[in-house]
A protein has these predicted regions:
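Acidic/histidine-rich alpha-helical segments that form the ligand environment
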Residues: 44, 98-131, 137-152
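Short, contiguous alpha-helical
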Residues: 34-48, 54-92, 131-172
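Short, solvent-exposed loop/beta-turn-alpha elements that line the ligand-binding surface or hinge
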Residues: 95
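Bacterial N-terminal signal peptides
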Residues: 9-20
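Boundary of Sec targeting at the N-terminus
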Residues: 23-25
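Positively charged n-region of N-terminal signal peptides that target proteins for export
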Residues: 1-7
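A composition/secondary-structure signal for short, hydrophobic, low-basic-content segments
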Residues: 3, 19-21, 149-152
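Terminal, regulation- and interaction-focused segments at domain boundaries
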Residues: 28-32, 102
Length: 172
């Protein structure tokens, strides 16, 4: 009987600890995705540095150039930050950046703004509905959609660099 009570007490304690961990998870979500945006920032800025002078290169007709991909990332960061903070996007497409230094600065600024928006979300904010690309989704869904897309563009940018004989800075 004593053994059963001890085991029961251990189970109750374990469940109580798990409940507190589950309740703490959402804040970890914001921190983890803020960190992911920071990692993407470093990698895209690094690629923009080593691909300077090759921004117009593209593997073929009808696909984005190196610079087009970087400009898209900046635009996506702005769209997502606006969606997460409730700011209304004017819909005006910014002029394409072609200068390597300005590109690096714009990438850095766009990711800093995005990280601030992500880490500023409350747990309840994650479930707030927003419209992104004409679709209704939660802020958490919008965050996942854009960051997944950016990881694909990171792979694309790495392939573009390697096709030009350029090694990504973190691979050296």
């Amino acid at each position: 009987m004593k053994k059963i009570l001890t085991q029961y007490g251990a189970y109750v304690l374990a469940i109580a600890l798990m409940v507190s961990l589950v309740q703490a998870q959402p804040a970890k979500f914001q921190a983890a995705f803020g960190e992911d945006a920071g990692t993407l920032s470093k990698k895209f800025i690094g690629l923009a540095q080593v691909m300077a002078g090759k921004f117009e290169w593209k593997p073929g007709q009808g696909v984005r150039s190196v610079g087009d991909v970087f400009n898209l990332i900046i635009e996506e960061n702005g769209l997502l930050a606006d969606a997460l903070t409730g700011k209304t996007n004017t819909g005006a497409e910014p002029a394409a950046i072609t200068d390597p230094g300005k590109m690096q600065d714009a990438l850095k600024a766009s990711y800093a703004n995005l990280q601030k928006a992500i880490t500023g979300l409350s747990d309840n904010d994650l479930q707030t509905h927003v419209k992104l690309f004409g679709e209704d989704m939660t802020k958490q869904g919008a965050l996942l959609l854009i960051l997944e897309d950016q990881h694909e563009h990171l792979g694309q940018s790495i392939a573009y660099a390697r096709s030009n004989g350029v090694v990504p800075p973190w691979s050296k």
